[in-house]
Amino acid sequence: MKIAALNMCVMILFRRKAIALGQKAKLMQERENPGIKTVRPMKDGVIADFNAAEMMIRGFIKQVNSKRRSLFTPNIKMVVGIPSGSTEVEIRAVRDSSEHAGGREVYLIYEPMASALGIGLDVEAPKGNMVVDIGGGTTEIAVISLGGIVCQDSIKVAGDVFTNDIQMYLRQQHNIKVGAITAERIKIAIGAVIPDLDEEPDPYQVTGPNLMTAHPVHASISYQEIAHCLDKSVGRIETGILHVLEQTPPELYSDIVENGIHLAGGGSLLRGLAKRLTEKVSIPFHVADDPLRAVARGTCLALKNTENYTFLMR
């Protein structure tokens, strides 16, 4: 089995044909000319453009099967992660796109469950495990026990919102216009959610046009500024976590207090996040090993063991 690690669902189209996908497309994003179009088939964790999503999945399949030569269409089995708050219409769109792209056996798994599998939690155990997966489009919060999701919340506040927060902050406070790619680099380099880190990253030097004059402007951005501009968005995630804990049955709540809450997804790499959430909720938070790929690892495990994990999927 081959895993294609694709960090970003971005496509570059030329005359309605995909010419770049994933990381290659990301390098071209915001640098295209009028004849080339950037498309993000997914928005807030669900399909926003059905045809583009189908092309994207076909591209993924082609990358995985690039060295295989056959006269026959390969029998492709797929497991696709979906937000736990997906509607039936959104779920059907994912399944249809996957089948039209060449999937013969298509299974869907909720992302918090996939994340828990990827972290290494025993999702079938009769005890409560809580997962907070902060992805690109959504933050998935769920309590899992006996192979099922007991209570959950899916919040449309995650990495993309953080990136937009940074862009808006630079416009308002520094009068600098930056693109999403630059804002994401800032987020990765100095992204933080508390103003007093033990290990402080160096300020990020950013250059961009002045909004009023279009003259080049240089600014030094500190991690404290990023913590300030992300404060409200992180606060919405805190509210979601508390909301799910309020719904959690007492016995499972006791398990969570004992074992802590597990953080996954790229957003969990924000500096100081586990500390801030621990202080807010009064329950320990643990960042998973390699949290960026937790969902990918979980879907891979589910794909390898579809016979044993059918009760986890739909």
Residue ranges and their predicted role:
Residues M1-I134, A142-I261, S268-R314:
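Nucleotide/phosphate-binding catalytic cleft detector across ATP-hydrolyzing
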